[in-house]
């Protein structure tokens, strides 16, 4: 195995530096829990340095020609694509994602996102509002300012592009707090950004712990907006922390996606799509189809096929190109997912498959959990209501459309959901009434840089991607011009 190229310092003002107090944290390979690197840990003073650098860089970056900003973002996309082998290896070692996924999905989706937003700076159009005679009223969109971004550990590289792309395109400068579990690919992106010519202070990366660096970034009076992806519990803390200067907040939080299989669905397609919905990335996805709802007429037939497919998924070394499922990203998270397997049994549920660490001796040192399928006792069970965030799917059955719609919406979350049917009317009616920011029909977990991504209810607010994201990172400015209006004298003398 070749050794990937990466940095371990904080990235502030275009330099990799140690934290001011010399603090570091350990980064582990979840395949065998071996030490990958010691990375500088950002504390409050380091966040202050990064915010100051971003604040200093903001006026010139915001004033730069939009097309020039786009050229730089495009160059970053090209550099990431050129670094594909290195970045995919780095992401696999850091996260446990199988190399086939990091190479073909994570890196290439990152490239596609930066390329999309490379074309957006000069398309951030304003409007002219028809107002009273004699006046011209035009509205421009201006950058928010210094943006704090908190990136999660489940897709660190891809989410770096989701947040950096629109923020930079809109003319903002950024301080990004990467998760302590998986900081390496984001630091590499920062290094590539410097190489292609991004000015000092435009991009700053401060890896660290959420309760220290993340909390302080959300509180910081020098930050104008915070964008957070992570748990709902932490999202609430972000909102509270941001109140000091009433900064704008964008949240993409937890999910408990309903994946509904109707009696007229193409079962083979639904089986494969449903397995992808929950087992891709070891189930560590906020949009995972973690509640599998089967029409009672096809439940047994579907389950027979689904269980056979799930049992055949190849767990192994994520560097092996034939591996289909790698480890969870940390030992702590492995223990959490295994804990839900115990909860399922305590609640009277039936574990139909998995629920344990694989018996293969080669996998014992890692953070593996077998693909797990559970039949719940009621939809009010914890395993049906709480986000597990692992290769753990709960199965239930339904009789008709009205019942399954009620089941699907019986959750605090509202991020994504899917349904499989050949009935066009049913498909659109269900999509209309499902309480989710995204609905997939005869597919699951599809997204594109131009399509809005985000949720409702306890899954947060605001949107990633597309023109919607550009609006998240800009403010409308209304300008009134008196051309030849006859304004009455208000104080006649």
Give the ranges of each region predicted by the language model.
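Conserved C-terminal structural/oligomerization subdomain of aldehyde/semialdehyde dehydrogenase
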Residues: 34-38, 260, 314, 341, ...
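Glycine-rich loop-to-alpha-helix module at the N-terminal edge of alpha/beta enzyme cores
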Residues: 34-124, 134
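Structural signal for hydrophobic packing residues in well-ordered secondary-structure cores
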Residues: 58, 62, 77-84, 88, ...
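Rossmann-like NAD(P) dinucleotide-binding subdomain of oxidoreductase/dehydrogenase enzymes
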Residues: 81, 126-269, 398
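ALDH superfamily catalytic-core signature
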Residues: 233-378, 402, 441, 488-492
